[in-house]
Every structure is written in C-alpha cells, then in structure tokens.
C-alpha cells in the first residue's frame, strides 16, 4: 500500500527504468496466462506494486448485452468492495463508458472535476489524477477499458504515464483476443467479433452527471453528494426553487444507482385532487368507485424494485401523508377498494419548493414524515446564486436546442454577458425558454443580444435598466420593460434609432421588442 507521505518519493522513482521493469513483469505474466480473470488481476498487481498505479481496473465489453463489466479490480485490504464484479456500465456512461464509446484515452488531472465521474466503486481519491485507455480489438474496435489512479500529481508527468498505460493496454488486448474471443473471429475478419465497437449514444446518457452543467462550488458539492447517495437506497429530499432542476437530480440518482435497470416513475403530487391522488399512486380494485371498470396498478406498484420520484411533496394532503409514511416505515400498502396488503420495494426521492420546516410548524405537514423524507437532503441553489455557471449552461442549452431544431446555432459573447446580468427568477427553466425563444427569432443561427427577450418585465437586465439618459430624470426606474421602451420611443419622437441610443441598445433590438411586445407605432 502506498501512503500519501511517500507519494513524492514514488513520483520521482517513476522513470523510464521503472516503466521498463513493470512492462517486463507484465509481459511475463501475460506470456504464462491460462485463466483470464487471474491473469488480469496479476497485471493490476504489477501496476500497483511496480508502476505506482493505484486502484487499477480492467473492464470488458459484451456487445450482446451491451454492457461493460469489471473483470479485474485492484483493491487494498482495507478497501475491499464486495460485489465489485457485478457493477456494470453502459457505453457512454461514466468515464470508462465514455472511453469505450469514443475509443480514445482520457486523462484527468483531478478525477472529481469531471462531471461524468460516477464513483460507483467508492475507491478513488477525488484529488488524484485518473487515466483510462481503451483495449483495442480486431478492426480497431474497443473491447474494453484499462483505468487507474496515477500517483504522478504533477500534470507534466501524466502524458508519460498515459503512454505507459496505452502500451500495457495493447499487451492486455492481445492476450484477451487470444484467450476470450472466439477463433472464428480471427478466421473471418469480415464478420463482427463478439465484442464490438459500442454505439456512441445510449438512452441512459440523458440522465448521467454529464447532463448536469456547472463548475461552481455549489454544483461541485451537489455532484459529489449524488455520487455518494446513488449507491444506497437512502430516501432523498431535493429542495429548491421552481426551475432549478430537481427532477434532473432525481434522474441522475436513479440512473447511477443499483436500481438503474428498474423503473423510474415520476409523479407530481399537486397535479390531481385528493380524491384521485390515492387511486393514481396506490392503484384501485375493480368496482372501487364509479368508473373503476378494472383493476389498476398504482405508481408505487409500477415502481416496485425501482425509484418513485414524488415532486411537490409539500402540496400533499394529510391522508396521503399518512399512507406514504406507512409505506416508508413498513413497505406495505393496499389498493383503493381492496383489502389485500401488498409489499413494495421502492426507493423514494421527494422534491419540494416549500419551506417544510415552516409547514411542519403550521401543522400542514406531518413532522414524522418530514424526518422520514429528510434523511439525505439536497439543496439546489437558484441560478442567481451561481452566475458563474450561466455561460456554460447557455452553451449547453443552445446545443440541445440546435439538436432538437435540426440546425446549427451559436450564441455570441454579447448575448452571454446580457444573460449574466439578469437575475433569472425562473431559474434554469426560464433560461432554457429564453434561449429557445431567441433561437426561433434568430434567422441567421446566431443568438445575439438583439433577440434576447426576458419573461419578467419587472426584472429587466442591467443593459436596459441603466443607461446614460436615465440620469436626466426622464426614465422612471419603476417602469417595466415594455413601459421603458414606450417611454424611450416617446422621448425619441418614435424614431427607433434614437430610442435605441437612449436605452443603450441596437436598433434591431428595439425593433424586435416592438414586435414581440405588441407596441403600436404611430404613423409619422
């Protein structure tokens, strides 16, 4: 085991001579290979003992099941992870899934900085470098991934470590082809072997941490919490204002958990009146009420073995809260109109934009249920508190909108600056709506300042709220955006170019706002 106090010494020793010694020992191990799993485990031991590569992992891809499985994992005695070989990755999922999908090496100076890092093994030091390289099979198709922690903390040493691991990966891949791949693949090069190049996109990609954008301290902390809580069945309470992405958090937790292959069922507790809520969630028997012509399973039964996301839990009634508490405590329920007790195995992720502590104090929310739900709270900050993420979010959303519209879109630096001056009371949802509206207005494919329109007229960006002429006293700061524009037009004699100068805008921006805000221009 390599202690952190020895890390500086070990880094200095990792030179060409040490690499050669490690490579020689690995070649001996591979030349004597008789059993794949045992051989790969011995290779990882050499990487750990002689090449100072911690927590080495070798994953192999099964194209029939479309999964990447851990074949060998180097662990220390005090970090043994039971069932590690049962952990699976889909192509494009996490760091190793990305390497498999792209067929290219991945080097991270600090592993936790990458949003695709899932940490399902709970072995890795978040502050250490991470290197993952593909194992290339016949016809340049990846058949697996070799990954490890590099003890070389200095970034300038990482390229040498990467080249060393790529060489080791080539040796491993050759051995795997001889031991695992069927001989028919070698005899028929035109046929696809059992292990094929994976598809670049899979349905799970929309739910991974790579879909969570932001490098602010608050978002880094949230991503770390998601990695940790995903491994367990702990009940999670996601809190935050409307539009902050609470459902996205729930999706990420489920799809990176051991329950990922099971159902993820969503339900909005405020969407139905109380008399229909219980039937929708718990199901009903035939004849339970007028219109119940057949038995129907509820959301809890549909989510059995998986995850149930209860949005707006703070809006639920007292009777529903009592039944939910029973399920959380005992895992039991009955359908409406039935007397058969059903057992369900469901993980609950709840979300609310309410201050539940105050609701408990007022008697609107059960205190015992509050403590049952609040086992692992995740508080999402509003967008105005992480303005450093707005630029990255905007570029991400523009790419998403461009894909949905089937065209090329770009956003200018000026538009980004304007977005960063707005306080976004509707949070990320409002930002996405704003950019989608701007994309529709952008005929050239460039989203610039002149096509950016905001929803909240009482919360204009600084570019419109503050301008030189306002000091003359003619522009009342209490006016909303439409009223400001009309005031400027009246001041300018309804000449759009003059009004634009008064507001610090371009004539095109003024023209767009006149059209969108339905301002009638007098005939001069």
From Swiss-Prot:
Keywords: Activator, ATP-binding, DNA-binding, Nitrogen fixation, Nucleotide-binding, Transcription, Transcription regulation, Two-component regulatory system. Residues 35-176 form the GAF domain. InterPro entries: AAA+_ATPase, GAF, GAF-like_dom_sf, Homeodomain-like_sf, HTH_Fis, Nif-specific_regulatory_prot, P-loop_NTPase, Sigma_54_int. GO terms for biological process: nitrogen fixation; phosphorelay signal transduction system. GO terms for molecular function: ATP binding; ATP hydrolysis activity; DNA-binding transcription factor activity; sequence-specific DNA binding. Residues 496-515 bind DNA. CDD domains: AAA. Residues 1-182 are annotated as: A domain. It comes from the Bacteria. Residues 212-481 form the Sigma-54 factor interaction domain. Disulfide bonds: none annotated. Residues 482-524 are annotated as: C-terminal DNA-binding domain. ATP binds at residues 240-247, 303-312. Interacts with sigma-54. PANTHER family: PTS-DEPENDENT DIHYDROXYACETONE KINASE OPERON REGULATORY PROTEIN-RELATED, TRANSCRIPTIONAL REGULATORY PROTEIN. Required for activation of most nif operons, which are directly involved in nitrogen fixation. This is Nif-specific regulatory protein. The lineage of its organism: Bacteria, Pseudomonadati, Pseudomonadota, Gammaproteobacteria, Enterobacterales.
């Amino acid at each position: 085991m390599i202690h952190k106090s020895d890390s500086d010494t070990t880094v200095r020793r990792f030179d060409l001579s040490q690499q050669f010694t490690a490579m020689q020992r690995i070649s001996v191990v591979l030349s004597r290979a008789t059993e794949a799993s045992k051989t790969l485990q011995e290779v990882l031991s050499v990487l750990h003992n002689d090449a100072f590569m911690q927590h080495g992992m070798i994953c192999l891809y099964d194209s029939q099941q479309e999964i990447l499985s851990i074949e060998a994992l180097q662990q220390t005695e005090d970090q043994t992870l039971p069932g590690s070989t049962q952990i699976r990755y889909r192509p494009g999922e996490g760091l190793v899934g990305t390497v498999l999908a792209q067929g290219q090496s991945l080097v991270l100076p600090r592993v936790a900085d990458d949003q695709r890092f899932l940490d399902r093994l709970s072995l890795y030091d978040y502050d250490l470098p991470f290197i993952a390289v593909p194992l290339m099979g016949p016809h340049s198709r990846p058949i697996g991934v070799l990954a490890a922690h590099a003890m070389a903390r200095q970034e300038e040493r990482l390229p040498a470590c990467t080249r060393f691991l790529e060489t080791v990966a080539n040796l491993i891949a050759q051995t795997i082809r001889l031991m695992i791949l069927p001989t028919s693949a070698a005899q028929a090069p035109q046929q696809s072997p059992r292990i094929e190049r994976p598809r670049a996109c899979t349905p799970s990609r929309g739910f991974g941490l790579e879909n969570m954008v932001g490098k602010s301290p608050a978002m880094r902390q949230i991503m770390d919490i998601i990695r940790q809580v995903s491994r367990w069945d702990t009940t999670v309470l996601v809190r935050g204002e409307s539009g902050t992405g609470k459902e996205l958090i729930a999706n990420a937790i489920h799809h990176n958990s051991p329950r990922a292959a099971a159902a993820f069922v969503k339900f909005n507790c405020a969407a139905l009146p109380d008399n229909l809520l219980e039937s929708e969630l718990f199901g009903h028997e035939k004849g339970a009420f007028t219109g119940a012509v057949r038995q129907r399973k509820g959301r809890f039964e549909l989510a059995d073995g998986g995850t149930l996301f209860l949005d707006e839990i703070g809006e639920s009634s007292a009777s529903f809260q009592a039944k939910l508490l029973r399920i959380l405590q005992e895992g039991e329920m009955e359908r409406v109109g039935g007397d058969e007790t059903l057992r369900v195995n469901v993980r609950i992720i709840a979300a609310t934009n309410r201050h539940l502590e105050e609701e408990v104090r007022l008697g609107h929310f059960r205190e015992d249920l509050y403590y049952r739900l609040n086992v692992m709270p995740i508080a999402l900050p509003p967008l105005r508190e992480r303005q450093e993420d707005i630029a990255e979010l905007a570029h991400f959303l523009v790419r998403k909108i461009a894909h949905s519209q089937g065209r090329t879109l770009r956003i200018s630096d000026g538009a980004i600056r304007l977005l960063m001056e707005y306080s976004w009371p509707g949070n990320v949802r409002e930002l996405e709506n704003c950019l989608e509206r701007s994309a529709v207005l952008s005929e050239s494919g460039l989203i610039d300042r002149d096509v950016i329109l905001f929803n909240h007229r009482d919360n204009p960006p600084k570019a419109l709220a503050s301008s030189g002429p306002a000091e003359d006293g003619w522009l009342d700061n209490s006016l909303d955006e439409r009223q400001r524009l009309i005031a400027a037009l009246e001041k300018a004699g309804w000449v759009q170019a003059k009004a634009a100068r008064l507001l610090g805008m371009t004539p095109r921006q003024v023209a767009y706002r006149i059209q969108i805000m339905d301002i009638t221009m007098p005939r001069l």
